[in-house]
Amino acid sequence: SGFIKENEEAAGEGLFLAVRGPLSRQKLLDQGFKCPEIYGDPALLLPRIYNPLKNKQYKVGIIPHYIDQDNKWLDQFKDDPSINIIDILDPTVCNFVDEIKKCEIILSSSLHGIVCGDAYGVPSYWIKLSNKVIGKGFKFKDYFLSVKRNDKKPIIIKKNTKLDSVINHRLIKDYKIDIDLDLLYKVCPFKGIH
């Protein structure tokens, strides 16, 4: 739904109905494409398709990007009943959503962990577990602009970073997303798929 990195180019022809955010739109315009000023990651529409009631079971959900899943910092939480390590590669979207909804907050190095948290009203924060995720944060910044979040950079996680210091980090603050999801839904080409 958008570019991953700043120096990327669109491949071939395309009809653009919406894009992740204004940074992706500007890149398309600069490359000669037409692109309406309609923003939003399609995952923000998930609650219109699937929105079960779930009780909160975990203080924190951690969603590592697939490239970060073997990060040693995560090992300390494997047996902690208050922490839910959520697999971004879960092939069942419903299971993934259920696990997010069971958490009080989400810490994620995966953009879609943050997007899905936002979609379901679970406060979600960008963490950086490694330098392996490509794009220097371009897709995160693009998304944050689309929903009018003020996030500019991730919370850096190191091997000895304590979870309490992350939860109490100055970047962890209340926010509310602000985006016209009706407009995004109106142009959505996969309406009615359940």
Where does each model-flagged region fall?
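Active-site anion-handling motifs in enzyme catalytic cores
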Residues: S1-H194
